[in-house]
């Protein structure tokens, strides 16, 4: 299955890395590597994530996985998996939609 990454995700990860690097460059690199490794896991096992509909009060076909302090939101298509957003796990996910 192919992997697509929303351009917003790439930009957000860049900002996330810069923010974390202000305190700890090594941790910033490690965090971003872990997130990209999670993307690869999702690509290989697209149904590994939980259904987001179980955490929110509206219908959605998004799935999510936790990666440290972050939540990766994605959708599974017929030929691809698309990463839509990576958010802080303490952020109110419902405000994204």
For the regions a protein language model found, what residue spans apply to each?
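Aromatic side chains
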Residues: 19, 36-39, 45, 62-64, ...
């Amino acid at each position: 299955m192919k992997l697509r990454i929303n351009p917003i995700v790439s930009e957000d990860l860049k900002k996330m890395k810069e923010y974390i690097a202000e305190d700890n460059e090594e941790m910033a690199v490690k965090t971003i590597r872990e997130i990209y490794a999670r993307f690869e896991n999702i690509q290989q096992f697209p149904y590994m994530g939980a259904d987001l509909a179980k955490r929110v009060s509206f219908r959605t076909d998004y799935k999510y996985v936790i990666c440290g302090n972050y939540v990766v939101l994605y959708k599974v298509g017929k030929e691809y998996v698309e990463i839509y957003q990576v958010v802080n796990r303490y952020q109110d996910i419902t405000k994204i939609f």
